[in-house]
């Protein structure tokens, strides 16, 4: 299909100093868990975006020196020749598809804890990092106040890193000053308390950054386009950088040294104000700030705001708010987003849902990222998975999939892409499984994009292969139904449900009196069904670390109920990693929801629950003989009155159908069945991203020797003395 001519402006080349970006799509720097020690992963993941039409593709934050070692988080480095060699794999792959490659020069100050290098960073003043106190970080980290000699040494570290980036082949060198990193700590009065010529007035606080840009420009000349990433407002009011004060003044002051501005808002402790989750922030949520940048510079501007909608992209470019569409998460969800716009396939875009699960993996530290929408993200190199290309089927075995949730619908989509005849059966009115329920919770409406993408693709694939079928609103299938169905391969994707009796991870037993068959006790599924009345006083018993309990609390508080949450773990603790945590806590406070932390439930009765502090038995331990606990009896139990109890304790796989079929394996051959598989939550409850991955994986590997269990993937391993597998080809090999 041809591109809609309305979008032509998005494909207009633009000069960036000595370089030219071929269109207006710019993958801003973002972490992916590869660093420089997994060059294959980095090369393949970034390269697929260049293939997909992103005109410029950047590294993640790239440490310039051991002083800014960001371990425990995995990030790139450009310290030496070895790093250059590993990064060159990405550069060459990006260039092979006609895109520019960019390197973001990172110096974190105390925000980079240097756990591996054990060095101390330098900064304008001494301060301890507010970022280092978030979950997953190692307590407080401090820097050293730089004297003039150390300041100049730091500037030279930037220059040396810029030269290494140029010699690696990068087209763009980006001095990272957003998210309270590097030069922003000198500009920002929140950090800079100096009284010499590098502190105090605006001109003095801007001096370090300006001098650094001058020195880099002299060193690299016009060999690269020079970029700086800048937070134009740190959202701290007069205590930080404000847009209409230091923000625009700095844009004007630094513009002569730059070829491109990469702008955003916020700091690092709450960088979800920039990488805004869809729960709180819509597309283009930074525009109230970014729309003013062009008045202070004549240089091109790239801005972000989770741009996933081509119409919104067109709007902001035509309005002159920004010149280039910057994106991280939308480029992860769909590496081919620009190409699909170019080819007139807008409805094929795999839209970012804004859940920030990708970010959560980096926030946890040490793990490669994942994507809820795109199961191939991070798997391109090690598994050879291309997001848009698939191996043709290797047999004529048709497949019956029972359950059209995240795992089942993704498995069906990929199998149909490969040419298999698939029958997808579900009891619900729509595909998507429990995503349909989750998307009804406050702020989570855009999570329905996960369902919508798969539904659209399945409908298209049905037209290509009329023998395929999607059967919705069906009665639950039995083992007899499946044995008689006639499919060669059977995939059970029946999902999971919340425990109806309060079984939880601390006791692995039901909570006495907790019984969701009673009118005053509900599971989340029963809340979604809406068949049970909910009383004025709602008590949520929470043993889960993610979104369900806080979302239900918000739902009922907004509806006028008095809500209390008794929670064993931090309420929505995992949401700290998805950058939803701070605003969720503000919202909980604003709505008057009462949170009882470190609190378990020992009994449920009509009209009340018995709660206890989980540490109430005291710390002293002694051996008291068989049948006796080593600590004192917990005496902190108290009764709390309520009208309705909601159990958010644990999820249990709905695997009865799978186990019945396995028990009747002797009947498979006579009924033409060769394999029965179980995937997604039906195998083990997990987040949507991992359930989707599991369905995708089975569809890719269904002809392998043991498809139920994933095949080994290619590891990027440093082995002592020799390669881990000397016969293994290190090149990227697509399974297409």
Curated annotation (Swiss-Prot):
Residues the record lists as binding [4Fe-4S] cluster: 352, 355, 358, 371
Catalytic residues in the record: 181
Enzyme class: oxidoreductase
GO molecular function: 4 iron, 4 sulfur cluster binding; dimethylamine dehydrogenase activity; FMN binding; metal ion binding
UniProt keyword annotations, A-Z: 4Fe-4S, Flavoprotein, FMN, Iron, Iron-sulfur, Metal-binding, Oxidoreductase
CDD domains: TMADH_HD_FMN
Residues binding ADP: 398-427
Cofactor: FMN; [4Fe-4S] cluster
Family assignment from sequence similarity: In the N-terminal section; belongs to the NADH:flavin oxidoreductase/NADH oxidase family.
The enzyme's E.C. designation: 1.5.8.1
Listed GO biological process terms: catabolic process
Superkingdom of origin: Bacteria
Gene: dmd
Catalytic activity: dimethylamine + oxidized [electron-transfer flavoprotein] + H2O + H(+) = methylamine + reduced [electron-transfer flavoprotein] + formaldehyde
Pfam families, A to Z: NAD_binding_8, Oxidored_FMN, OYE-like_second_a-b
UniProt keyword 4Fe-4S present: yes
Name the UniProt record assigns to this protein: Dimethylamine dehydrogenase
Binding sites annotated in the UniProt record for substrate: 176-179
Entry keyword Endoplasmic reticulum: no
Residues carrying S-6-FMN cysteine: 31
Xref: SUPFAM superfamilies: FMN-linked oxidoreductases, Nucleotide-binding domain
Cofactor binding annotation: Binds 1 FMN covalently per subunit.
Residues engaged in binding FMN: 229, 329
